[in-house]
A protein has these predicted regions:
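Short, aromatic/basic-rich helix-turn unit that serves as a nucleic-acid recognition element
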Residues: 122
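GIY-YIG nuclease catalytic motif and its immediate N-terminal context
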Residues: 1-96, 101, 110, 125-146, ...
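Short, conserved catalytic or adaptor-binding loops enriched in Gly and charged residues
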Residues: 111-118
Length: 155
């Protein structure tokens, strides 16, 4: 799991990132500079057999789709993007931006996407199945990397 703290960083501004497998269960850590912001996983219910079946189909699944959703900045159905909006974007909004959002001249989601692309990067690791990813995610939320994520630590 040290790879999630010290492995190669990938910028959200470079999405899609070729290194991310198109079909995989696994984990990802999100960083703002050297600050550990978030830990996430994808492929929760996927067995190794299910992952292989999906590879044969050739349709993206798991890590790729989850990171793509985060890169989009859309808050609907994406808790990470909600956290980014609440903790990083909303406190920085000017009165002019708030007015523009209320008049539908700009969207909050577009500002969330801009923030993610301008400030955040990620690391990832593939796991053999979703159950393994879920277990490791819980350990990391508890501090197994020596630090807890800012946005989603275990309370």
């Amino acid at each position: 799991i040290d790879h999630l703290a010290s492995g190669p960083r990938h910028l959200f501004s470079g999405w899609p990132v070729a290194a991310v497998p198109e079909v995989a269960a696994g984990l990802y850590s999100i960083w703002k500079g050297d600050q550990f912001v978030y830990i996430g996983m994808s492929g929760r219910s996927a067995s190794s057999e299910e992952l292989e079946r999906r590879r044969q189909i050739g349709k993206t699944f798991g890590l790729f789709n989850r990171l793509a959703a985060h890169a989009s900045g859309r808050r609907s159905g994406d808790q990470f993007c909600v956290y980014v909006a609440d903790i990083f974007v909303l406190p920085q909004l000017t009165s002019a931006q708030i007015k523009a959002i209320s008049q539908r001249q700009i969207t909050l989601d577009s500002l969330v996407k801009k923030y993610i692309h301008d400030h955040l990067s990620f690391r990832f690791m593939e796991t053999s199945d979703g159950a393994t990813a879920l277990r490791i995610e819980a350990e990391i939320k508890d501090g197994s990397l020596g630090i807890k994520p800012l946005l989603n630590p275990t309370p």
